[in-house]
Amino acid sequence: PTAGPEETAAPEPSPEASAAPEASDAPSGGKTLVVYYSATGNTQEAANLIAELTGGDLFELEPADPYTDEDLNYGDENSRVVYEHDNPDARDVALVQDTVDNWDEYDTVFLGYPIWWGIAAWPVDDFVTANDFTGKTVIPFCTSASSGLGESGELLAEVAGTGDWLEGQRFPSRVSREDV
């Protein structure tokens, strides 16, 4: 079953998570950027750990109209996130900033997000469509209590149209240094 936005219970890591590249597998060369959207802080924690381990810079994706706890109540059919889920045209979530200063200096981009109903949380889409990933290696990562990475990375790569998108990694909602 697919789950709503970032659940709280953290199961054991799935086999598919261990088959994906680890943060330490980032290609060597230019600078590393860790871009993330975090609705409840779980993805932010994973992003902080990846940045620490890779020496990467952090860039947080912030919706211009931030999600409240009520907005993220996927059990409430009247919540914002359920409305956006049921109405794909409503998923165009504007960001405070959708481009990164000195974007051309980065060769490796880790892109993090929670899984919402089996796909990347839609605030990430605005960032992906606003940037040219040509010449960049992109490593998606997600946080989820139960859902795997699924096709979220492939779908974002399709939206981007450029870049070398690797398989990626799923982390449990309560990520630890050992998980990364």
Where are the language model's segments positioned?
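Active-site-proximal alpha-helix that buttresses catalytic centers in soluble enzyme cores
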Residues: 1-180
